[in-house]
């Protein structure tokens, strides 16, 4: 059965058809040029997924921003008094909190027969409003535990995950969330494709792009996780095809999922993806979402990763 993707109008396109269209966009300068992100000029920004205790060190090494967890940063279950103090703590740090991940906790069900979008929408809306107040640009929507389609559907009498219906439920959630936060101006939710052994829906950048195109909201974009792309053998052409939808990236080394530069022999695998980012004029963030090591090695590894990324 071909890999499928949600597309405008509720139809499906298989992976081969999408790759052909992506290759066409890449090959025609007039098309690829009109698909570049809205931001112009500048350069790619580099950050790391770490907590606030590490931000001072990251700043001294030369990183541009940091990325934290939504629950830790904004905790939508806590009151406004807590949030005001938290917002001040974030603002006092020497680097901007540009992105956050871990958007929807696994306690919420977004797909399957027991999906209940109401509580998850309330949680997500409050998180996004706090994220905008804090100056966050992108909130990463991976959340495999919440989005993975459970196996308790029945298809033609056979129990199993109804992936197509699950993707529609996920897209419906994105659509309603974007409607609720249409008044926001800067923060965007970015759909994170996860490799197949972590999620049974939205495994490729081109699939996330189809949902974005259908929802058609300025509050929704795409994330390209270069580690997941390498593991899923997804071509860098998907980055070019995503073009204007691409708002954030993650990266980790190929074999061990450690910091960039931890495996000198595999660094060359990053180059096609960075060439694609440069081809579309990408000036968003690239966060190291990876293992770092401990103790004295940690600072050295932060430096190694940043040097590696700047050379690409």
Give a label for each model feature:
Residues 1-13:
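N-terminal secretory signal peptides
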Residues 6, 16-24, 28, 36-46, ...:
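Histidine-acidic metal/acid-base catalytic patches
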Residues 23, 28, 109-221, 300, ...:
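Active-site acidic/histidine proton-transfer and metal-coordination neighborhood
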Residues 64, 68-171, 257-260, 270, ...:
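Structural motif corresponding to the early beta-alpha repeats
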Residues 105, 196, 229:
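Active-site loop signature of alpha/beta-hydrolase-fold enzymes
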């Amino acid at each position: 059965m071909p890999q499928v993707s949600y597309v405008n109008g509720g139809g499906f396109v298989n992976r081969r058809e999408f790759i052909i269209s992506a290759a066409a966009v890449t090959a025609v300068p007039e098309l690829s040029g009109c698909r570049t992100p809205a931001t112009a000029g500048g350069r790619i920004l580099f950050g790391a997924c770490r907590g606030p205790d590490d931000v001072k060190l990251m700043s001294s090494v030369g990183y541009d921003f940091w990325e934290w967890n939504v629950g830790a940063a904004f905790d939508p279950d806590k009151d406004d008094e807590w949030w005001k103090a938290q917002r001040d703590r974030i603002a006092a740090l020497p680097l901007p909190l540009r992105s956050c991940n871990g958007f929807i906790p696994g306690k919420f069900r977004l797909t399957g027969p027991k999906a209940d979008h109401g509580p998850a929408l309330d949680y997500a809306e409050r998180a996004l409003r706090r994220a905008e107040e804090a100056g966050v640009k992108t909130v990463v929507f991976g959340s495999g535990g919440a989005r993975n389609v459970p196996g308790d559907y029945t298809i033609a009498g056979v129990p199993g995950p109804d992936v197509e219906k699950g993707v529609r439920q996920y897209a419906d959630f994105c659509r309603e969330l974007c409607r609720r936060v249409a008044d926001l101006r800067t923060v965007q939710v970015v759909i994170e494709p996860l490799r197949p052994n972590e999620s049974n829906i939205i495994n490729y950048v081109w699939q996330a792009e189809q949902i974005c195109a259908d929802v058609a909201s300025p509050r929704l974009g795409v994330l390209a996780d270069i580690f997941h792309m390498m593991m899923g053998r997804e071509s860098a052409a998907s980055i070019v095809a995503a073009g204007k939808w691409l708002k954030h990236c993650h990266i980790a080394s190929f074999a061990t999922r450690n910091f960039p530069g931890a495996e000198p022999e595999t660094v060359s695998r990053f180059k096609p993806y960075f060439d694609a980012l440069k081809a579309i004029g990408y000036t968003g963030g690239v966060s190291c979402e990876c293992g770092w090591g401990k103790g004295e090695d940690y600072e050295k590894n932060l430096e190694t990763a940043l040097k590696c990324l700047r050379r690409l």
